[in-house]
């Protein structure tokens, strides 16, 4: 692998100043550097990756053992080595084939849980399960991290398919979040879902207790309108939640990969079991593609390799995710957790510090909003930010087709502008037509130059349906896997979240005035003194 890394770096240095636009002298450039799956098109031709770089990147994936580790993951091997666990979120969307963990086929239990979820959701949506004031009108999902970001993103994305109760999401321990969410709801017609595998997550359980007190003001048996997604049956029982409304999942399903199962309960309630199954089917389709397609035609592999080229080879530290699809507004935040919690590591699988950067900083906002905010830096800033556009050919509002046309034209224009830029000569010509001359023209022209030659990709799809969203989410999950394998890291633990939790527990009595700040650094002690109640 070392030789391939070196060859990639040498090639990048040789072509660093080449204009990406020049690559399009090849009339087949766009076709060659694009990949299709069903109605999805991934166009990565507006990057500086040429045939040589592509072939080296594919060789890198082969040398890293992506194919072998891929099969190990799907077969239930314990590839999460630091926690001694399998990584089988894929089984949640492929329940029709045996998957063995420690020699036991886990799919019968998955099918049973899925059937229980469907039965509960059908009862709730039909009015057979009611609140103490009538049919359930609102559902509040209380969770954090993977118990919140995925289902919240998906509920917004699939809003056109939401024909069930309204779904709300509470994650932050800041009391303002749950206060503002509950204040306009009726406790007697609200269901609260507490999503915590251990039923001990501080933020989640604090909010759950607050919700229970809120509900108790209006209903005689508040726990009767709670459901739980947890494996801690003793704790959910102590909370008062009947076992029929408790849905568990295994430790080989990581939080940020979990919305395919019980963590997706709120999503299933919102869109119904049939649409939820279509979401699962879309993910399963991407799984099959990932397992079967050769690397040169494999969407998750290619997304990963393009990302590695930009981050590890070119040194671009961030990637902007820019969905030109308002209902994907939460996708960048979801991908922040998926990618940065998975691949934001400093130690390789063997315990040694990495000799290269790990995953990139992922951020973004939906278009066209971002064009009037941070695109200035993307187009004319001194740092190059690779951009990842997502856009649908068709919207959900046929009476607003013209607005969708404007949206798509803006997406394509931004991608083209990043590629093409605007030269100083072109800027002079434009200003000259406006009547500027001499030194003022020259002064203004410099400010109107766009360097261009900034890489971007476009993921286009027919329409944002449940199946399409399933394909997109699974695509990014597998991208993370491929990048992690090539970087030699464990993408499925998250020890970086632990230290802050431990310190927060120690700080609570200090902030309450029950303990001193001995042993704390001067800054923390000062802040405790200022913020102490």
Swiss-Prot record:
Pathway: Carbohydrate biosynthesis; gluconeogenesis; Carbohydrate degradation; glycolysis; D-glyceraldehyde 3-phosphate and glycerone phosphate from D-glucose: step 2/4. CDD domains: SIS_PGI_1, SIS_PGI_2. GO terms for cellular component: cytosol. Pfam families: PGI. PROSITE patterns: P_GLUCOSE_ISOMERASE_1, P_GLUCOSE_ISOMERASE_2, P_GLUCOSE_ISOMERASE_3. Its main location: cytoplasm. It catalyses: alpha-D-glucose 6-phosphate = beta-D-fructose 6-phosphate. Its EC number is 5.3.1.9. Coiled coil: none annotated. The active site is at 341 (proton donor), 372, 501. It is found in: Cytoplasm. GO terms for biological process: gluconeogenesis; glucose 6-phosphate metabolic process; glycolytic process. GO terms for molecular function: carbohydrate derivative binding; glucose-6-phosphate isomerase activity; monosaccharide binding. Belongs to the GPI family. SUPFAM superfamilies: SIS domain. It is an enzyme of class 5 (isomerase). The keyword Cytoplasm applies. PANTHER family: GLUCOSE-6-PHOSPHATE ISOMERASE. Catalyzes the reversible isomerization of glucose-6-phosphate to fructose-6-phosphate. Keywords: Cytoplasm, Gluconeogenesis, Glycolysis, Isomerase. This is Glucose-6-phosphate isomerase.
């Amino acid at each position: 692998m070392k030789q391939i890394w070196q060859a990639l770096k040498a090639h990048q240095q040789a072509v660093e100043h080449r204009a990406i636009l020049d690559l399009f002298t090849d009339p087949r450039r766009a076709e060659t550097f694009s990949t299709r799956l069903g109605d999805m098109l991934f166009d990565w031709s507006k990057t500086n990756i040429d045939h040589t770089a592509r072939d080296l990147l594919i060789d890198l994936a082969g040398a890293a053992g992506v194919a072998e580790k891929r099969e190990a993951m799907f077969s239930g091997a314990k590839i999460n080595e630091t926690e001694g666990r399998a990584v089988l979120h894929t089984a949640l969307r492929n329940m029709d084939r045996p998957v063995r963990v420690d020699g036991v086929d886990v799919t019968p239990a998955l099918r049973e849980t899925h059937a229980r979820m469907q039965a509960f959701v059908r009862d709730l949506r039909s009015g057979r399960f009611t609140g103490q004031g009538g049919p359930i009108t609102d559902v509040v999902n209380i969770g954090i991290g993977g118990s919140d970001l995925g289902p919240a993103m998906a509920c917004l994305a699939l809003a056109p398919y939401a024909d069930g109760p309204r779904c709300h999401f509470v994650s932050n321990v800041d009391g303002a979040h749950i206060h503002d969410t509950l204040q306009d709801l009726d406790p007697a017609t609200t269901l609260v879902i507490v999503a915590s595998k251990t039923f001990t997550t501080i933020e989640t359980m604090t909010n759950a207790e607050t919700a229970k007190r809120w509900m108790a003001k209006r209903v005689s048996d508040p726990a009767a309108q709670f459901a739980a997604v947890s494996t801690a049956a003793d704790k959910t029982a102590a909370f008062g939640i009947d076992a029929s409304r408790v849905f568990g999942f295994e430790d080989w399903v990581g939080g940020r990969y979990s919305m395919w199962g019980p963590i997706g309960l709120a999503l299933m309630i919102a869109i119904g079991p049939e649409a939820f199954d279509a979401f699962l089917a879309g993910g399963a389709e991407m799984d099959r593609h990932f397992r079967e397609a050769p690397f040169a035609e494999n969407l998750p592999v290619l997304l990963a390799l393009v990302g590695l080229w930009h981050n590890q080879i070119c040194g671009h530290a961030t990637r902007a995710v820019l969905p030109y699809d308002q209902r994907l507004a939460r996708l960048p935040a979801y991908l922040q957790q998926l990618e940065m919690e998975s691949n934001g590591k400093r130690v390789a699988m063997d315990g040694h510090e990495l000799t290269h950067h790990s995953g990139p900083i992922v951020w973004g906002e939906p278009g066209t909003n971002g064009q009037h905010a941070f695109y200035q830096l993307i187009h004319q800033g001194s740092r190059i930010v690779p951009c990842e556009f997502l856009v649908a050919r068709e919207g959900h509002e046929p009476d607003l087709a013209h607005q969708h046309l404007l949206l798509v034209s803006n997406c394509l224009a931004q991608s083209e502008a990043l590629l093409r830029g605007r030269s100083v000569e072109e800027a002079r010509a434009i200003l000259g037509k406006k009547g500027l001359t001499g030194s003022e023209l020259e002064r203004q022209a410099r400010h109107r130059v766009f360097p261009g030659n900034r890489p971007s990709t476009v993921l286009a799809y027919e329409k944002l349906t449940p199946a399409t969203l399933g394909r997109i989410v699974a695509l990014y999950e597998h991208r993370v896997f491929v990048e992690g394998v090539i970087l030699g890291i464990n993408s499925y633990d998250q020890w970086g979240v632990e230290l802050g939790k431990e310190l927060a527990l120690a700080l609570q009595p200090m902030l309450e005035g029950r303990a001193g700040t001995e042993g704390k650094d001067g800054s923390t002690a000062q802040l405790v003194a200022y913020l102490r109640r």
